[in-house]
């Protein structure tokens, strides 16, 4: 069963001058972790705000749990959990007070649904009397997740939940989401971090308000039909400029300590090495590698511009 459905949704701002979401359609099923993957400004938050009934789409239709996001906003708000990108709990209330407030607001108690938040809450329980505004970034996110889950929602919306928190907290949060999946909760999560795509059952890559691809992370990578080589040398900046002149180059870009060179077919690595050396580069290393989600995103973005 589809818990989330979007049909040709569009959204503009500034009296139609800024197109944030352009004719997007997708669906998310019960018990699925679905990732909306893209950089800042891609349209992720606008989609989340439409689905959580905070803003109205300009055109198209969307349903959450069978309810229309415009006509049935009250029903949707009662049955979903939403964790916005910006910390939005009450900073002057303690951890316990925030949690009890949200439980009361939804007509439930902490005890009734404690099994849903237990694994998360035990990590912040020692700070129960501390004001929420005084928590670390990772602790704030854990508290926000507890508050979003306390009424046992069928759909959980998480807008960039790992932005601004440390790597350990990021790892712990994804482990928590995988446990929640076993409760058949539909989890719709957005992130600018391409590596987090692998944590999802399916993903939608989004750029400038348009969907580039929707599939499982493995299928997205499997559809990459080019060859990628990781290249390094003694001068990273010069190396990028030189690679732009290579005849077989389709694309090249920095990737950590390497440059990724994208070509249509298998390369003669010796010939490439000589080309780089003849252009003043030394300590050259060339390795053919498998595409990552980020490589796929860059390639799909490039195709839409051609």
Task: Mark where each language-model region is.
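Conserved N-terminal strand/loop that marks the beginning of ABC ATPase nucleotide-binding domains
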Residues: 1-9
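Long alpha-helical scaffolds
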Residues: 3, 20, 62, 239-242
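Short loop/turn motifs at secondary-structure junctions
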Residues: 5, 79, 152, 199, ...
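Generic beta-strand hydrophobic packing signal
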Residues: 9, 24, 203, 252, ...
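ABC transporter nucleotide-binding domains
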Residues: 11-189, 194-206, 213
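Conserved protein kinase catalytic domain
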Residues: 77, 118, 221, 297-298
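ABC transporter nucleotide-binding domain
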Residues: 175-264
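Short, charged/small-residue-rich alpha-helical element at the C-terminal edge
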Residues: 228-306
């Amino acid at each position: 069963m589809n818990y989330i459905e979007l049909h040709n949704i569009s959204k503009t701002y500034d009296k139609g001058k800024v197109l944030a979401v352009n004719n997007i359609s997708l669906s998310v099923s019960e018990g699925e972790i679905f990732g909306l993957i893209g950089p800042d400004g891609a349209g992720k938050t606008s989609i989340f705000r439409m689905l959580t009934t905070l803003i109205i789409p300009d055109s198209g239709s969307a349903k959450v749990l069978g309810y229309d996001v415009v006509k049935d906003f009250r029903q949707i708000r009662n049955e979903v959990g939403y964790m916005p990108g910006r910390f939005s709990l009450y900073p002057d209330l303690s951890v316990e007070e925030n949690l009890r407030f949200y439980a009361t607001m939804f007509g439930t108690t902490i005890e009734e649904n404690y099994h849903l938040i237990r694994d998360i809450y035990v990590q912040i329980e020692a700070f129960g009397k501390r004001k929420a505004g005084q928590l670390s970034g990772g602790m704030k996110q854990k508290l926000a997740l507890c508050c979003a889950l306390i009424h046992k929602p069928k759909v959980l919306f998480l807008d960039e939940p790992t932005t601004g928190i440390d790597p350990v907290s990021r790892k712990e949060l994804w482990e928590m989401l995988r446990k929640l999946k076993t409760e058949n909760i539909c989890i719709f999560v957005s992130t600018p971090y391409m590596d987090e795509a692998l944590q999802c059952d399916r993903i939608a890559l989004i750029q400038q308000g348009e969907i580039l691809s929707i599939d499982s992370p493995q299928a997205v990578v499997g559809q990459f039909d080019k060859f990628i080589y990781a290249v390094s040398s003694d001068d990273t900046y010069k190396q990028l400029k030189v690679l732009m002149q290579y005849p077989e180059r389709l694309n090249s870009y920095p990737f950590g300590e390497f440059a990724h060179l994208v070509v249509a077919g298998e390369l003669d690595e010796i010939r490439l090495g000589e080309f780089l050396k003849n252009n003043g580069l030394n300590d050259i290393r060339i390795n053919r590698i498998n595409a990552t989600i980020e490589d796929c995103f860059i390639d799909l973005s490039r195709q839409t511009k051609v």
